[in-house]
Amino acid sequence: MAKESSFDIVSKVELPEVQNAIQIALKEISTRYDFKGSKSDISLDKEELVLVSDDEFKLSQLKDVLVSKLIKRNVPTKNIDYGKVENASGGTVRQRAKLVQGIDKDNAKKINTIIKNSGLKVKSQVQDDQVRVTGKNKDDLQQIISAVRGADLPIDVQFINFR
């Protein structure tokens, strides 16, 4: 009779959008007065950002510029895991930031408990780095989406394949 509906909960960062945001941020840095003559750079190496600047203050400003450009390009900034600031060559400082892709086991468990605590008749299962939610009623699935969106998760989640 009624076909089961489902959707997937994923956590992805679009790397082309990150690259575009980096290019825009570098363009702004090259024209800003407070960055004149400084050795500031942002690069993307696979799924890791590398920020380099003269000192920690300029590094924090560099990070602020990058975050503002990422927000404008709709890239989730929750999925950026910043490392510690370290000394680099030439008297500069470097900070690495890992782009978190996918939902790890701990966050998948948190999402599952949110779904179970909702009390709705839906099933959830962890599949690699995503969580699939199935149920007969589409309204229940939409309530699950709003419950997961409202939860305070350490990563940004997207909802795809709503069938």
UniProtKB/Swiss-Prot annotation:
The residue range of the signal peptide is none
InterPro entries to which the protein is assigned, alphabetical:
DUF520, UPF0234-like_C, UPF0234_N, YajQ-like_sf
Instruction: Write down a Pfam family by its short name.
Output: DUF520
Give an example GO cellular component term for this record: cytosol
- Protein keywords: Nucleotide-binding
Annotated GO molecular function terms are: nucleotide binding
According to the lineage, what is the superkingdom?
Bacteria
Return the similarity comment: Belongs to the YajQ family.
- NCBIfam families assigned to the protein according to its UniProt record, in alphabetical order: PRK05412.1
Q: Which HAMAP family match?
A: YajQ
Reported function: Nucleotide-binding protein.
Name the record gives this protein: Nucleotide-binding protein BSU11020
What gene codes for this chain? yitK
